[in-house]
């Protein structure tokens, strides 16, 4: 339909396995390097470059099965936060080291650095919320930023989502910061910049069967999910995938994504010149503290 355009529909796409790996880097490795070695992994987007490199190389060095299990035991560790789960994660890293030692692609150093995170893992896990792996919250936040670039104010209606409903007060509070300033402030760096306060006017929740807009969004989102899942698996000969691919404009609906690429240079990542190593979370916290003074 001519009514379905990027001006009316926007989507955030998450590669879940890659997102898990980025969480390992951001939640475990980054604090170890920063607090123990005074090294800023966010400088020039090195955290993203490392995530891209490891996602491509780990399966080649240790095998896809060991890599998938690595992501699985990390997920379990973050959910359970128990001594048993922590032990299972670091024991699996030892198994990966043994496999890497037999590989023509040397990755022992990278695995050894990950093993060193055992020094800070309990502190890191303590700070992780239960929703840490749920993409709904960062996706909604990013969509609010995108719609705010298109509209002075807007209302949001979301389907019944427990993680989002639990954060409703947070999003409303960020939007209400407009009362403290007429102009938005840009935080972050390069292609990770966002504008705050959010231009969100109201936030409401509705069952999908009560909202035509949510039902239409569900259909479009399902099509995108199918398309990118098949693309991720390399199943590009699938009949429905080819029909979707033949449309030629699905990518136009994606306003942002967490997806692996082969980009490893600051310029390719859109972070060239970010010598300060801007951490989006820290920039956001600084913004809130400044407004609350």
List PLM regions with ranges.
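Phosphate-ester processing/binding pockets and catalytic centers
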Residues: 1-293
């Amino acid at each position: 339909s001519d009514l379905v355009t990027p001006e009316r529909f926007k989507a955030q796409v998450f590669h879940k396995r890659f997102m898990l790996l980025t969480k390992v880097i951001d939640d475990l490795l980054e604090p170890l390097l920063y607090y123990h070695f005074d090294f800023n992994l966010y400088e020039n987007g090195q955290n993203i470059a490392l995530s891209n490199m490891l996602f491509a190389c780990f399966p080649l060095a240790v095998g896809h099965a060991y890599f998938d299990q690595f992501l699985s035991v990390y997920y379990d560790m973050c959910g359970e936060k128990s001594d048993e789960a922590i032990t299972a994660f670091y024991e699996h890293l030892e198994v990966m080291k043994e496999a890497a030692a037999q590989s023509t692609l040397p990755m022992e150093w990278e695995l050894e650095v990950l093993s060193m995170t055992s020094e800070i893992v309990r502190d890191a896990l303590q700070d992780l919320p239960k929703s840490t792996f749920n993409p709904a919250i960062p996706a909604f936040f990013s969509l609010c930023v995108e719609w705010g670039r298109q509209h002075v104010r807007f209302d949001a209606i979301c389907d019944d989502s427990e993680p989002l409903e639990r954060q409703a007060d947070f999003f409303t509070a960020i939007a209400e910061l407009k009362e403290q300033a007429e102009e938005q402030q840009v935080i972050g760096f390069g292609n990770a910049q966002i504008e705050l306060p959010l231009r969100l006017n109201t936030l409401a929740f509705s069952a999908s069967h009560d909202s035509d807009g949510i039902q239409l969004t569900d259909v479009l989102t399902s099509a995108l999910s199918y398309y990118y899942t098949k693309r991720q698996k390399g199943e590009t000969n699938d009949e429905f995938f080819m029909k979707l691919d033949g449309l030629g404009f699905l990518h136009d609906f994606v306003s942002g994504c967490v997806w692996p690429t082969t980009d490893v240079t600051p310029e390719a990542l859109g972070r060239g010149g970010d010598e300060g190593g801007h951490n989006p979370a820290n920039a956001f916290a600084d913004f809130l503290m400044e407004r609350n003074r």
